[in-house]
Amino acid sequence: MATNTSSNLLTNPYTEREKKLIDEAYYRDLKYNLTSKSRWKFIGDVSETLSQICVGTSSVLAFASGFFEDIDILAFVAGTVGVGSLVLLQFSSYAMKESSERTQQVNVILTKLGLETIPDIVVEPSIIKARLQGELGEQENDVVIEV
């Protein structure tokens, strides 16, 4: 009975086929996760921007509803826009979390392949605040922007 040595494994046609399939799977996963990472980051940025616009609009409408007392619908619209702002802000947080998750998935594959990892460009506001207060040091793979 023959034993499999490392030289036999390298020349084995099944091993080469399997290696090719695994490499293709890694490539597909990297491509998908990099695209998803960018897409979720964009969605998060847009959602957060829209949320801030809604907060401003809601504030103006709330003020206007007190000034124009005969237009009852203004208070309702102000409240509705304010709630919409909260929904958009929560969705933005979800999208940023998804972007970070995709970055982690990409980094797992890159590490497995022996390649350099990419930094996570999403930093939660609580982390920024803690760093500014000196509570946390720099973390691996974080992009720190001095303010």
Swiss-Prot record:
Keywords: Host membrane, Membrane, Transmembrane, Transmembrane helix, Virion. It is a single-pass membrane protein. Its main location: virion. GO terms for cellular component: host cell membrane; membrane; virion component. Coiled coil: none annotated. The keyword Membrane applies. It is found in: Virion; Host membrane. The chain crosses the membrane at residues 71-91. This is Uncharacterized protein R695. It comes from Acanthamoeba polyphaga mimivirus (APMV).
